């Protein structure tokens, strides 16, 4: 029996590189956003708010990252399961209402393990997802 295990987590350096990539893409599509990164335990590692981004997007982006990390899937993937009558209806009311049920949060996976997650808020759901995917593309190139 092992009494401990090593846990990989995303680094601040990687989070900063992803933030740069997201900011560049957000400027390109003219959408000011808040970009958040959490570590493997869902704890805040980085939050970056672009000029003119909605203040409310700070909590939303962080909670998207938290959700993607803790549920080990994109936030857009749980939308159907939380609708009235579905198996996870009401899930968004748990965890001190930190669970976000629309797109913009994605887990960061390395060697089959979630090592953190990203969250983007400020644009449409489609724009937020695009920018979250931009972050993952950047991470895969590091």
From Swiss-Prot:
It comes from the Bacteria. InterPro entries: GlcG_carb_metab_protein (IPR052517), PduO/GlcC-like (IPR005624), PduO/GlcC-like_sf (IPR038084). Belongs to the GlcG family. This is Uncharacterized 15.0 kDa protein in dhaT-dhaS intergenic region. It comes from Citrobacter freundii.
